[in-house]
Swiss-Prot record:
It is found in: Secreted, Cell wall. It comes from the Eukaryota. This is 57 kDa cell wall protein. Its main location: secreted. One of its GO terms (cellular component) is extracellular region. Keywords: Cell wall, Secreted.
Amino acid sequence: QDPYVDFLK
């Protein structure tokens, strides 16, 4: 999973 996806959470 990309870090950006985790940032959007």
